């Protein structure tokens, strides 16, 4: 990892013991993010996206533990930090916006007091008037009109989109360098989703923080990300710039994800879907985790885990299809000439686009 990175994760593995066995939630994951960059981690539910990001903040469930690997953020070895040290880093070095704002907020405390608590924790020595001023500043920053009046209201007075703005204000109270956004729009309707994504993107440019999105929505990825990590079975299986992953995908799982986009469906034909189910992470996975669902699987996929093969200096994929000895396969028809297909959708006013 040669860039001047703000966050570097190397060979990280996270296990969760249970009565049914040990869940290998994250398996030998490496990635890096530069200052001001936007990384999107994309994949199906249960692939390890959220647990990976919670590992970086050391907010793992009680039984979960990092069994190998290192995490370096802003020059610090996070894996060696104590809980006391982590409490000082959470909110300042990194912060998180969770999926459901209703459960992230206390229903019995006014919004203003909840934001004020976040301010006082991360900015010691402020007077009561200064804290109040900062609360109003944050509420204004995230687009909440009439902040003086609304600071006195409770979470149930707000819509889902406005609650997510309140959560975002709390997340930004400590001026973090890294913001994790864990499915921040899943609980919202489509028009509000677009507003929240646009707001985070604008704030990221204004405040210069790094953003890591956790999502299964490829439309979000296309519109906001600089780099993409495609996850499957607890691993990143393809990593590159958003243009490389969307327009030159190399892993069969990435092919399948893109092929299943409704926007690429052909009228009168059945939409593509990925058959089978994701692997159980209780078991030791042999070979390529995607092999049982992969219509292009080779014999070696069931026997030996593939390494990362470089496609370019910034693009890597964990598939035996990139081995020089592998047969040459054409991509599925749905994702051939994907750049032109997306451009046509954009020209017609479609919501899905790559900037």
Annotate the PLM regions.
Residues 65-77:
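Conserved ABC transporter NBD signature motif
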Residues 173-177:
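A short, proline-enriched helix->beta-strand linker immediately N-terminal to the Walker B motif
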Residues 44, 58, 180-184, 188, ...:
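P-loop NTP-binding/switch modules centered on Walker-like glycine-rich loops
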Residues 76-77, 129-149, 258:
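Conserved ABC ATPase "signature" region
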Residues 3-5, 145, 149, 241-348:
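Short catalytic/signature loops enriched in Gly
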Residues 78-95, 121, 244-249, 281-285:
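ABC ATPase NBD coupling module
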């Amino acid at each position: 990892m040669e860039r001047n990175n703000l966050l570097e994760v190397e060979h990280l593995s996270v296990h969760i013991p249970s009565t049914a066995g040990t869940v290998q939630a994250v398996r030998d994951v490496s990635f890096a993010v530069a200052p001001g960059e936007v990384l999107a981690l994309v994949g199906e539910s249960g692939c390890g996206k959220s647990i990976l990001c919670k590992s970086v903040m050391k907010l793992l469930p009680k039984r979960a533990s990092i069994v190998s690997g290192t995490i370096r953020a802003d020059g610090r070895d996070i894996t060696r930090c104590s809980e006391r040290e982590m409490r000082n880093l959470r909110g300042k070095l990194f912060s998180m916006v969770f999926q459901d704002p209703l459960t992230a907020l206390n229903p019995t405390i006014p919004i203003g007091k909840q934001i004020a608590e976040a301010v006082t924790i991360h900015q010691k020595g402020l007077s009561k008037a200064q804290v109040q001023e900062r609360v109003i500043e944050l509420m204004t920053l995230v687009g909440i009109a009439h902040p003086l009046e609304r600071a006195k209201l409770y979470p149930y007075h707000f819509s889902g989109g406005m609650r997510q703005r309140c959560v975002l204000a709390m997340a930004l109270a400590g001026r973090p360098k890294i913001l994790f956004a864990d499915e921040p729009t899943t609980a919202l309707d489509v028009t509000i989703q677009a507003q929240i994504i646009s707001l985070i993107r604008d704030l990221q440019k204004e405040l210069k923080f790094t953003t890591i999105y956790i999502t299964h929505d490829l439309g979000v990825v296309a519109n906001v990300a600089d780099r993409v990590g495609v996850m499957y079975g607890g691993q990143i299986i393809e990593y590159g710039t958003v243009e490389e992953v969307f327009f030159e995908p190399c892993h069969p799982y990435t092919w399948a994800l893109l092929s299943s986009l409704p926007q690429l469906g052909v009228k009168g034909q059945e939409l593509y879907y990925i058959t089978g189910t994701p692997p159980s992470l209780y078991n030791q996975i042999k070979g390529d985790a995607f092999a049982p669902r992969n219509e292009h699987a080779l014999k070696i996929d069931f026997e030996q885990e593939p390494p990362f093969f470089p496609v370019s200096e910034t693009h890597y994929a964990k598939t035996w299809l990139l081995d020089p000895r592998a047969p040459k396969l054409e991509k599925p028809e749905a994702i051939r000439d994907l750049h032109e297909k997306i451009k046509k959708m954009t020209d017609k006013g479609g919501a899905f686009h790559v900037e």
